[in-house]
């Protein structure tokens, strides 16, 4: 029987002790790997949804809140900005493109976003069926919403004011579904897209604006940078929630936020800066959980150490006989060391499997995420090597004691 086979046999000879060591080691590794997977996954999701967006401009308030509401659609907007101010800003030579967003309404808990076709193009979205929304009270629905609510082309959607179910509705202004998007793995899967003009119409009520002395208010104006065609009256009186800006040059990153924040009612929010700040806030909790995982691994290493010491005491005559039958001191040393490494490998494998399986189940259960939870992070190799190192250190002292044991003294006491 070779050294490895003998080590495995000895490990399974003490099932309860070995199981305790494996479980402790596995749970410690699982905690650290789970945190690693979660943080990497969140960063990837954030980067995917913020792609192509250099700056978000909204009403004065928290920059982080503006980012969460306008990019990730998980917070309330800070307010509205006038269409006129937004249009003037997009004329700045530092702005390459701008996508308007009008937020605030929902349908059965899912957010309705007034925008232009440039918004789904930002995420390279495609249609599963039907067409893109138009200016006349039509809507294109995200894949997850269509699946969960059974929405199909031709259905009527009565929006609700606010972002929660049960809020006051706009029954007199229903949207007609004209298209369903393909799953994109982005925030679009959870959104209902309509035109900005449709949002204005929903909130205009039944009022008819009569401007006899100013008929030119109904003359159409093309806002090329915003991708909108509006009347002069709308340009002067309507609002939007935010703008998604693409810089024309790197210099804009320095100058444009300062220009925006210098105005009385506009706030610039940088996605990279605000998401980094968010991760710094989350990072404190991540560090605490990582420390917990490390403590559990150290405790498990202590368990391996104690198990090997106890095994050494119980098997001292067996080891002495092996020595008398020709086994070298080095072979005895390697036998005990290998037993510790086997426990470490089994525990680590259990921890990695538990972390990946648990994370995959968690991701699959989250309807707003279309990505797979089964992926591997390069830093997992560091966890693997670190776990193996801890296991080796926990095994060295028992192995050295076995190496130094006096076989003649042991056999004389038999």
Q: Which residues are covered by each model-predicted region?
A:
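Hydrophobic secondary-structure segments that place a key small or acidic residue at a functional site
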Residues: 106-116, 126-210
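N-terminal Sec/SRP start-transfer signal
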Residues: 1-34, 44, 337
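Transmembrane alpha-helical interface segments in multi-pass membrane proteins
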Residues: 296-299, 309, 316-362, 386-390, ...
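Hydrophobic, regular-secondary-structure patches
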Residues: 36-111, 118-121, 135, 232-233, ...
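Conserved transmembrane alpha-helices of multi-pass membrane proteins
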Residues: 354, 366-400, 409-414
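Short helix-to-coil transition segments within interhelical loops
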Residues: 11, 323-330, 405, 414
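Internal alpha-helical transmembrane segments of multipass membrane proteins
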Residues: 23, 287-307
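Mechanotransmission and gating elements of multispan inner-membrane complexes involved in transport
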Residues: 171-172, 180-286
